């Protein structure tokens, strides 16, 4: 008998969202409520994953079906972010040598490569509809670079001794440029010069002394231009929708190649042999099923996926069940227990060092305290919630971790 899963239901003016979590923070609830209150998203199936927490512009853990409108800000700036998981034939690795190789050959933080990686040949970024808004040279030199924040390179060991290389990274600054361009275009297309027109009208009415009429006029003008939708939820439709989908898919491919380039540098530099490899993506639109996933991953029937928990507990290798009620999706991690700012305030380096004992890492430093295991929800909390959408095949535990500070 399937056990009951804790769930929070959020009813809005035009839609109802289901969040697969026992507890929902107020900020995340407000963001989800805002989406459910927009008539433009009526009829979209909104399902929010157990690792839910408030994000910039949209709740992390959001999945929703889409039709002819998309909010670029909901996919976010790190388009195509995800994990490349590689099973290795080796059972032992020289971690000191690996760490030195990564620090020498893989740019991290805001750094990019001096030379472009050979995998650039598989992508033509000049085909982006917004190519003139993008620093193409920097983008090309970013393929094979890690970035900062929660991005990491890790070696994990399964219970049977097998080793897995996991690389978590995204589309670097290119994703930010593409996302910001389309979000701005969406705002312009929706509102045009409406804000300017309203301001000019108010100034004129004040000059004419018609103060009592101002509020009524503003309301009428706002209705005329439909300014009710929040700034963060400005959407694109029509030709802009098509252009965004085109550029998002290219940027998604860029992110995949970025991870594969880092894998290539590590495998060739260390002389390691891959046995199996799979990709798990968590900020994108699945254009086959027309499902938006923000901080959530695809879990189609039979699909292999990785759910990383934290840098102490490792990851879950899972097989999707294809649960339509969950939008064939799963969480992309454990989800944050506290914001980055709160983590820096509340957590200690002593505790961080103690929690990471037994794992080879040179990255347990004050700058990465916000990424410490204590800043995330527990593995048990996630395992309890995901039974309807995935089968856990195995848990892999970190033996090496590299995480850049920003």
PLM region descriptions:
Residues 1-6:
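Short, Lys/Arg-enriched N-terminal segments with co-localized hydrophobic residues
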Residues 8-34, 41-48, 54-60, 69-72, ...:
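Domain-length cofactor-binding catalytic modules of enzymes
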Residues 52-53, 81:
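Acidic, glycine-rich active-site loops and adjacent beta-strand->loop/helix elements
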């Amino acid at each position: 008998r399937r056990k009951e899963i804790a769930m929070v239901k959020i009813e809005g003016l035009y839609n109802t969202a289901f969040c697969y979590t026992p507890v929902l923070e107020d900020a995340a609830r407000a963001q989800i409520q805002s989406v459910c209150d927009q008539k433009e998203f009526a009829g979209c199936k909104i399902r929010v994953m157990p690792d839910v927490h408030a994000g910039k512009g949209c709740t992390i853990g959001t999945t929703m079906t889409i039709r002819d409108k998309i909010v670029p800000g909901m996919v976010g700036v790190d388009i195509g972010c995800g994990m490349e998981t590689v099973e290795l034939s080796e059972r032992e690795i020289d971690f000191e040598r690996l760490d030195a190789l990564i620090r020498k050959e893989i740019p991290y933080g805001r750094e990019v490569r001096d030379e472009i990686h050979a995998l650039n040949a598989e992508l033509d970024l000049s085909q982006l509809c917004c190519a003139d808004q993008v620093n193409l040279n920097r983008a090309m030199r970013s393929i094979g670079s890690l970035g900062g924040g929660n991005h990491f390179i890790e070696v994990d060991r399964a219970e049977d001794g097998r080793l897995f290389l996991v690389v978590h990274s995204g589309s670097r600054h290119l994703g930010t440029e593409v996302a910001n361009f389309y979000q701005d275009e969406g705002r312009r297309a929706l509102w045009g010069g409406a804000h300017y027109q309203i301001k000019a009208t108010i100034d004129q009415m004040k000059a004419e002394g018609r103060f009592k009429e101002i509020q009524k006029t503003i309301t009428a003008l706002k209705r005329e231009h439909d300014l009710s939708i929040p700034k963060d939820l400005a959407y694109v439709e029509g030709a802009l929708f098509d252009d965004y989908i085109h550029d998002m898919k290219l940027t998604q491919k860029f992110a995949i190649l970025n991870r594969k380039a880092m894998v290539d540098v590590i495998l060739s530099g260390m002389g390691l042999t891959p046995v199996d490899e799979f990709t798990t993506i968590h900020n994108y639109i699945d254009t086959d099923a027309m499902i938006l996933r923000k901080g959530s991953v695809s879990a189609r029937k039979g699909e292999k996926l990785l759910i990383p928990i934290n840098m102490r507990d490792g990851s879950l290798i899972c097989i999707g069940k294809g649960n339509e009620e969950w939008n064939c999706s799963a969480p992309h991690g454990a989800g944050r227990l506290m914001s980055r700012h709160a983590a820096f305030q509340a957590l200690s380096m002593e505790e961080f060092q103690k929690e990471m004992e037994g794992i080879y890492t040179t990255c347990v430093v004050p700058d990465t305290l916000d990424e410490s295991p204590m800043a995330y929800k527990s593995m048990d909390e996630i395992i309890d919630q995901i039974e309807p959408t995935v089968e856990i095949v195995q848990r892999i535990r970190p033996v090496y971790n590299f995480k850049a500070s920003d």
